[in-house]
Amino acid sequence: VRKIIIPALILGILVLPVWGEIPSPEESLGFQVGADRKLADWQQIVRYFRELEQNSDRVLVQELGRTSQDNPFLLVVISHPDTLANLAGFQKIQEMLADPRKIEGDFQEFIEQGKTIVLTTCAIHSTEVASAQMSMEFAYDLARGEDPETEEILKNVIFLLVPSLNPDGVNMVNHWYQQTLGTPAEGESPPQLYHPYAGHDNNRDWYMLTQKETRLVVEKIHNVWHPQIVVDMHEMSAYGARMFVPPFMDPIDPNVDPILQAQIVSLGGSLFSAFIAAGKKGIVTQAIYDAYTPARAYQHYHGGVRILLETARARLATPIYLNKGELRSGDNYNVHRPSWNFPVPWEGGVWRLRDIVEYQKIGLRAALLHGARYRKAWLENFYRVGVASIQRSQPYAFVLPPEQRDSQSLYDLLEVLDFGKVEIQRAQEPFQVRSSTVVSAPLGLPNRREFPAGSYVILMQQPYGAFAKTLLEIQHYPGSREYPGGPFRRPFDVTAQTLGIQLGVETYQVMQPFEASLNEVDEVQVPSGQIEGEGIYGLFSHTDNAFARLVNRLFKQNRAVFWAPNGFSAEGASFPVGTLLVHFDEGEIAAQQLLEDIPLKVQLVKKRPELAWQQIRMPRIGLYKSFSSAIDEGWTRWILEGYEFPYQSLNDQDIREADLSEYDVILFPHQEPTKIEQGLGDSYPEQYRGGLGKEGMARLRQFASEGGTLVFLGEASRLPLLRWQLGGVDITDRLTSREFSVPGALLRVSVNNHHPIGYGMMEEAAVMFWHTPAFDLSRGLSVVHYSSKDPLLSGWIHGEEHLVGKTALAEIPMDQGRVILIGFRTQFRAQTRGTYKFLFNSLYYATTE
């Protein structure tokens, strides 16, 4: 059935469209949404929404772009037909309310005309299958409903529905589920990341904004529609409460406006009441989840609330049965005992996909009703949050000097702010401030009063100043214990995000107003590199992450590249250890062609400096890819591709059977050692079962003994210590959480920057410590170690005394080869760009003689 368009002019009369009968999801799919063992794939979901659009004047479907795997990314807009006819006008109202500086006169006229914008995002985590399915039935109900509640929603709300934030994953999980129906693997997660690069971390990308899907949503929904309410649909453990609704547990990021914090309580309470009134059991609030990190909540810093609806999962679309004794309590509630925040326990029984769909529909409808009934309050508070932001008194600004050790990371940081709609100014002349505080690594830099022309200035008196502030300031996480004398309560995610520290970008916080000649930066663009001097030998710095991209481009032209094992002078200039050298037959012309979008300076000299240059080659990289999927493996692929490293993925069978001499280096991303060794269990098809096993570990040892390099990241670095006699232990293994806890913090380390792995780094750096080993070595070389009794730079730590003197990055010889252990999270979520060089250098180091 499709929308019927009658020719516009019949006998001089304009005739409007006649709408066909609205098809139900069941009619389109051939099964009820939520039926046992039935899932629609992404193509079926897209087809259904197209049918709905063709047959309802309340529904508009927009394709915003394409996903990582080239699937259509949809936004479904649902509202009253009159509203849909004037979407541009309502977007303009939202734009004005989002930035009160644009409103001349009384803001109330915009309140009277505006609608509450409610955005619902489904299925970002693709094994949480219900919400993408539910979205079709929920949209159908709104498209055809004639009841007073539906009319109230349509009149007062513009409902933005994203059926899936990860369409690629919807297909992956669906296809896996269909393949395994009726087998022991039915209901298991697929043996691959369900986002091509980020896996589960695609919901930790809301400030770094790296992935295609994240950027589509931010650029074309958040920054256009400025929603007051964001409802993010998820599923959680099957063994606890049936549904979580906000408010969240403490702490909440103090940069979230108090008005928004109060609205989370109000909205969450309304949903909580709706579930209890509907007779639903197992509803918990103010438990399990906090709201501290911006990695999960873009809208908290852009005028709206982001609430989380977490429903207990089934086994994908397969029902489960749980008896009462199998249920487990969670943080801040007892699953067997009624309490104010968990008034009606669920007693166990069958739990199926349809139950999840029903719970989600109740919660989502309650959110829309709240937005409709309190439309004026939502819009007024949205406006007041903006007013408070542009009236912020302290800090006054953050300043980033233009000359940085790592220009690439400077532009990366500025691009994050710019994409998040933060206004960036640039100083036209030198200026002075009363005082400033450095908020970047190393913290030993002196505070500054004078800044040069070209400095970047981020004033806090702007609509999205909170986004800039939470990303640029140092975090002081308020740690707490589960009970007096008990273990420390673990945050839901990390406790630090300070970008100046993570990226190694010199950043200063200025508390008091100052005068400066500033111009707004229209768009952050990475400039191409510069050529200086004359000659055919090019020298360039190792301090900029972009060095790796240039080196790899040189390798693709079959040019020889060398790095300097010590500092030197050439043509009156000094160059540090690690400086790179390349020979250009064509001189400046050849160099300039390679420097497109690489912000590096290449110094040409006529004569090759005389020292013991060490040649490096394009590393032949084998990247371990476990069927017990490691999120860090996806991030590692994304980074390697972005910096133009060729690599080959290696699974367990490859390592056991392939010719490993084809590789210079085999890289193991962060993953638990047991998952690497043992892999998936017997419920999976045979080709996915098991891990490396003893045979795979023996092959790796042989590879290193014969001259290869093994690089282990994060928790994976515990594996060789456990299985081989390397002369080292992980000291965190023997410490309890009462003695030692670092839940995602940025810590100070000392670096041997005369070792090739440390080239380009300063003597002091910042590393991300999260699920991280620290080494006590009796042999090998410590390249990076924890030297300070006060290592915390941002976040939270307990028991820091245990780290003093321990190794963070080690090189351990193994016969003719080596094992490199990088305990900290050197490329964590593509955020810790200040420590990328440890990874890049390890790969190049594997090619040296």
Report residues per predicted region.
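Bacterial N-terminal signal peptides
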Residues: 7-17
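Carboxylate/His-rich catalytic cores and anion/metal-binding grooves
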Residues: 139-142, 156-178
